[in-house]
Amino acid sequence: MRVSYVCIDPGVPVFGAKGASVHVQEVVRALRRAGHEVVVHATRRGDLVPADLADLEVVEAPVRATDPARREREQAGISRRIAHDILAGGTDLVYERYSLFSTALAAVTRSCPARGVLEVNAPLIDEQREHRVLVNERAALHALCAQAGCARLTVCVSDPVRRWVERLAPGARALTVPNGVSLERIVPFPEDPSGVVVAFVGTLKPWHGVEDLMRAAALARAPWSVRVIGEGPQMPALRALADGLGLDVDFRGAVPPEEVPAHLAGAAVGVAPYPDLGGADEQYFSPLKVLEYLAAGLPVVASAVGQLPRTLQGVGVLVPPGDPARLAEAIDALAADPDERARLGALGRRRAEERHGWERVVATVLDRVRQDEGVEP
């Protein structure tokens, strides 16, 4: 099957280091491993190209406008040009990562027999309005309704995201399918024998709660150290906080996705200290980092928010969000108990293998399309 993968979000380079880029690459890998021919159409290619995707055809159409209103119009125009290119080249399936103002999937599926899958990872209209600049909200809503209305399936990474889609686009055929993890790229490894290392992987933004991890480390009663794998706008503040607390934190900075396993090597615990963002529907994420910890055979300590209690049931340790003292207690307990770390790590790896491999995630999506249409995708 010929698959046209579309990502018109200029904040998501195909070959980038952030979690969204990892998501794009892993879905493409899973499609290719299933025997499908994939062509990617995107507004940003990126330059961190992994060896196994070096032959991937990526058609880039950059967004150049900086003025918010012009930028929105340009994104809409690019989506129309991409749809034209896809129709000219032919396709069997359009798999589009939901982006503001794009109507590419709708345009293609209205004009040819190709099926469409819309993947929604976040309530982008709300995010753009609250955290950035949204000039033409009506156009953004119209585009979402067109896309979800034409998609054979709208895949949502969490129940709150699915509810958001169903509220704004009532005709959407929506299904919750959480994120996955590469079971080949990320595998278990031995702990560093010189000490317990607690690892965080992710972009350094306020809603990831890394400052609570720093404060927990300052409260620790057992010996353990912190390793932060990632970059972001909070890096200067986190470095200053670590210095002020007298912590020797191992900041690794941004790393390409294929190098994350090497930076996790030697860690003994993985942590996801999310704060309380104000209600269940605000905790709409499906965190890749937690699945990577599970695949790496790390015991996980995470805030009891969003999907994490379900994901970590029986295989992880949950703590109240925004509580460095409770976070420190949980990490202290694991730091002092290597047998419990080994037990939880083995259970976590098994959970990742049974439920969360990317091949399983993509197969779930394609199977649902086939069931709805009675056609083998």
Q: How would you describe each model-predicted region?
A:
Residues 4-6, 155, 190-221, 227:
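Conserved donor-binding/catalytic core segment of Leloir-type glycosyltransferases
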Residues 1-48, 52-54, 153, 215-218:
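N-terminal subdomain of nucleotide-sugar transferases
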